[in-house]
Amino acid sequence: YKRQIVCSGGDGTLDEVVTGVMEKKSSIPIGYIPAGSTNDFANSLFMPKSMTDAASMIMEEKLYHCDIGRFNNQSFTYIAAFGLFTDVAYQTDQDLKNILGHVAYLLEGVKRLFDIKSYHMRIESEELTVEDDFIFGMITNSRSVGGFKNLTGKNVDMNDGLFEVTMITRPKNPLELQEIMTAMLTAEDNTDLIHSFKSARVTITSEEPVPWTLDGEYGGSHTQIEIENCHEALNLYLKSTKNEETRSIGISPLINKKEK
């Protein structure tokens, strides 16, 4: 019989499955039926929103080789983040999430707007080295974060071997905060307050332990982390999409297992 894993749930559920597969250094195919509050990963790959359609997609047995992140000795599927709002996903009450869905995250996030904490960090990669006070940072392989699209920038390719890195420095006044929010919402890199670049490997050190979120789940507090892109490490069942969507996320190549 054919060995494969099929799971249903949100981004956190998929993270648990991928973590187990990565720990075993397995190449077993994974079928994913999105059923969470936000489903960032599924939306980034234009997966069917219908559970029945998602199951049918898995039955087609077409594989997409997706990049996966290594975070010290842990794994993440699409995002490692710290700072403002990043604990909302795992601190929002589960009953509230079940009732309100994505709105529950927004309500929890609004409560944090006036409690902004910064961390002094040094960010090192082949592309950029910078040291500053940061209120937020994310290393992503996704077109959607927290249900919002384009926050990670344009031309995101989920199997190019590179992460999209976004680091936001501490604003000194309300005008700078507004400048940051405008740049993030419009996906325009037109402010010196945000450092955005692509990289396969990033090292981040901090003066104090910083709480991290991995795929919406608590990833522990750390003073030094090494983040590495594991190129095409995940074998995921995924159907072909429209040409314009395919180009925007880098869905290539798809392999039909039945033809091998």
Show which residues each predicted segment covers.
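Short hydrophobic-aromatic micro-motifs
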Residues: Q74-D87, E131-N141, V145-G146, E164-M167, ...
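Conserved small/polar residues in nucleotide/adenosyl-binding loops
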Residues: Y1-Q4
